[in-house]
Amino acid sequence: MTAYKIDHIGVAVVSIDDALPVYRALGLEERRREEVPSQKVVTAFLPAGESSIELLEPMSEDSPVARFLMKRGPGIHHICFAVRDIEAAVRDLAGKGFRLINARPAPGAHGKKVVFLHPDSGHGVLIELSEDAS
């Protein structure tokens, strides 16, 4: 398994609309906004070179992002790495003893399959893997 690029950096926000002005001031523009019911969030992607910033707004108080915001406030939520074969990545990481939040890929933004490594395995960083089979 090889993570071949940083796909995006997820930023938890209370409101995407309230967060956009600072990113627009940096020259970034929102490309796509969508609801991701499996994660209970609305996402907005702002391309930045070969990567993107993903703004994450909770859809409900019981979403993982809402809990993150209540505990830590707005800020960097996760780093996402692109992988070609997410099933192989899950087997490889689990076989090496890393703790996965979801051992089965779930639907993420843009319909991509995603898994998350627990922050305990990522030295305090929530790591997302997203399958990009292209």
Regions found by a protein language model. Name each.
Residues I6-V13, Y23, L46, I53-L56, ...:
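Short, structured motif recognition centered on aromatic/hydrophobic residues
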Residues K5-D7, L26, E30-V41, M59-H77, ...:
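A cross-kingdom feature marking solvent-exposed beta-strand/loop segments within repeated
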Residues A19-V22, A89-L93:
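Hydrophobic side chains in well-ordered alpha-helices
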Residues A44-G49, I53-E54, F81, V90-S134:
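Vicinal oxygen chelate
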Residues M1-D18, P74-V83, A133-S134:
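N-terminal beta-strand motif that seeds the catalytic metal site of vicinal oxygen chelate
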Residues R72-G73, I86-R91:
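Long, charged/polar, surface-exposed segments that mediate recognition or autoinhibition
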Residues E50-I53, S60-D62, I86:
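Short, charged/polar surface micro-motifs in flexible loops or helix N-caps
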Residues V14-L28:
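An N-terminal domain-start capping segment
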